[in-house]
Amino acid sequence: MANPQRAGRLAQEVQRDVTDLLLKRINDPRVQDVTVTSVELSGDLQIATIYYSILSDLASDGQKAQAGLEAASGLIRKELGARLTVYKTPELKFVRDQSVQYGNHIEDLIRKLHADN
């Protein structure tokens, strides 16, 4: 198991680099509105779970973004391998972050509560 501080630093570095790659290197329109919200690394630093959000609430846009990220994962991993100073570049797993949608839902509930009073 890796040092937790090292894993945290590496996760931040992966998040910064993936964000940079999505903005500058990936030209796929499906990932145009994707924002990387956080990265979690497995204990052995072999798997990076990348959480992302998109501006649209439509399910079809979420599926398109997921497909675009999966299609670009090979290029992203290759570029990460050149940028990171680790023995083995982690495998990338993209997961849509639901916290933004949940936050919007809570905000709507609070607004309704205030409107009723």
From Swiss-Prot:
It comes from Leuconostoc citreum (strain KM20). It holds the Pfam family RBFA. One of several proteins that assist in the late maturation steps of the functional core of the 30S ribosomal subunit. Associates with free 30S ribosomal subunits (but not with 30S subunits that are part of 70S ribosomes or polysomes). Required for efficient processing of 16S rRNA. May interact with the 5'-terminal helix region of 16S rRNA. GO terms for cellular component: cytosol. PANTHER family: RIBOSOME-BINDING FACTOR A, CHLOROPLASTIC-RELATED. Monomer. Binds 30S ribosomal subunits, but not 50S ribosomal subunits or 70S ribosomes. Belongs to the RbfA family. GO terms for biological process: maturation of SSU-rRNA. InterPro entries: KH_dom-like_a/b, RbfA, RbfA_dom_sf, Ribosome-bd_factorA_CS. It is found in: Cytoplasm. Keywords: Cytoplasm, Ribosome biogenesis. Transmembrane segments: none annotated. GO terms for molecular function: ribosomal small subunit binding. This is Ribosome-binding factor A. Its main location: cytoplasm. Signal peptide: none annotated.
